[in-house]
């Protein structure tokens, strides 16, 4: 079955689209990635999405216009990726504007903005969306949702494999080996903390909006990281939590950046960006070390994907801090770094069609497995 996956993440830079084909048993599908495409958000739309994700108040009319603009961007990405309309089913994550994990016995909630009936009408094909709702209803975090799909797509290794997505937020998937004592272990996963979110906001601030990200790590390469503050930041509550845990721009947004820049004092732009970049790598390294110390799991591979994979300074910091794991990009496994999450949501849509569960309760904290997503047929 041909499926189209659409993903727009916390970096809010645009929509990644993937056309893929899935066949065979749901738990171990045969798959091929046929096309992928990135559709950039217009700068004003990107600005509005970032502001909404940080709790900026907006009148209802602007919320409606934002939902329409996001949906149209998804449609444009889908049409560009699949001009011949081969896909029989669309899996669309939507744009997260707020994520609230469960806390103090209060139910979690997460809002992925999308007008799914409009998207189904524009594409004249069924759309599966609202993937997080079922897991949240079962008491889970609703995130991360990629681990089960990661294991199905990129499993079968001789040792533990770690998959690291470097979007706005850094999240890890740990896939158990196909042989040995751990072969029956459950897949693991969680959100580590900021990857590009603070770096991108810092670049906008230091360049007065001229640059929205640190292209090629150029700014970070000119600076020196403040290791003392990095170690202090690693002691903060979120980074000491054990999984399941999830987070987003509501925690690591402009207010958080302002606090950290104030703590860095008179640091130059280059030193501040270098520190934020090293910090993003350090939160991942600390989580992997906590995993090793707590349950004895040490991945032999660390496979990166997402926009941060294109930042050589961030990759060098990961390589330096995550010793013992061979670092490589997901492209080495046949999945372009910018296509991984869109491929996951294409698979989740196919699983929804097949009635196959998509969450991992040990990862999200949900009370049981669930088929994820809500299907909307074209009008």
Swiss-Prot record:
Gene3D superfamilies per the UniProt record, alphabetical: 3.30.420.40
UniProt keyword terms in alphabetical order: ATP-binding, Carbohydrate metabolism, Kinase, Nucleotide-binding, Transferase
Superkingdom per UniProt: Bacteria
UniProt xrefs under InterPro entries: Anhydro_N_Ac-Mur_kinase, ATPase_NBD
Binding-site list for ATP: 9-16
HAMAP family (UniProt xref): AnhMurNAc_kinase
Family recorded in the similarity comment: Belongs to the anhydro-N-acetylmuramic acid kinase family.
Protein name: Anhydro-N-acetylmuramic acid kinase
Annotated source species: Synechococcus sp. (strain CC9605)
UniProt lineage: Bacteria, Bacillati, Cyanobacteriota, Cyanophyceae, Synechococcales
Gene name per UniProt: anmK
């Amino acid at each position: 079955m041909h499926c189209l996956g659409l993903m727009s993440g916390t970096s809010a830079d645009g929509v990644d689209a993937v056309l893929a084909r899935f066949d065979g048993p749901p738990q171990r599908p045969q798959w091929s990635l046929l096309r992928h495409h990135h559709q950039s958000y217009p700068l004003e739309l990107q600005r509005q999405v970032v502001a909404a994700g940080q709790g900026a108040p907006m009148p209802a009319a602007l919320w409606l216009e934002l939902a329409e603009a996001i949906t149209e961007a998804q449609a444009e990405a889908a049409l560009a990726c699949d001009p011949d309309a081969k896909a029989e089913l669309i899996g669309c994550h939507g744009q997260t504007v707020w994520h609230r994990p469960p806390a103090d016995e209060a139910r979690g909630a997460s809002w992925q903005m999308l007008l799914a009936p409009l998207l189904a009408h524009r594409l004249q094909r069924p759309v599966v969306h609202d993937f997080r709702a079922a897991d949240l209803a079962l008491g889970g975090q609703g995130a991360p949702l990629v681990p089960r799909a990661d294991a199905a797509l990129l499993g079968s290794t001789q040792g533990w494999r770690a998959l690291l997505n470097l979007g706005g937020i850094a999240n890890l998937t740990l896939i158990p080996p196909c042989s040995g004592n751990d072969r029956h272990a459950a897949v693991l996963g969680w959100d580590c903390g900021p990857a590009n979110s603070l770096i991108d906001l810092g670049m906008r601030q230091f360049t007065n909006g001229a640059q929205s990200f640190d292209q090629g790590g150029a700014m970070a390469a000119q600076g020196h990281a403040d290791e003392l503050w990095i170690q202090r930041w690693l002691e903060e509550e979120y980074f000491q939590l054990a999984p399941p845990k999830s987070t987003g721009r509501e925690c690591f947004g402009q207010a958080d950046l302002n606090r950290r820049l104030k703590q860095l004092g008179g640091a130059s732009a280059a030193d501040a960006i270098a520190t934020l970049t090293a910090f993003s790598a350090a939160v991942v390294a600390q989580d992997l070390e906590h995993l090793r110390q707590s349950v004895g799991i040490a991945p032999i591979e660390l496979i990166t994907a997402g926009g941060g994979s294109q930042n050589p300074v961030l990759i060098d910091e990961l390589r330096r801090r995550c010793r013992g794991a061979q670092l490589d990009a997901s492209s080495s496994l046949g999945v372009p770094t910018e296509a991984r999450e869109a491929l996951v949501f294409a698979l989740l849509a196919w699983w929804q069609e097949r009635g196959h569960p998509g969450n991992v309760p040990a990862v999200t904290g949900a009370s049981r497995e669930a088929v994820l997503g809500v299907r909307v047929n074209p009008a």
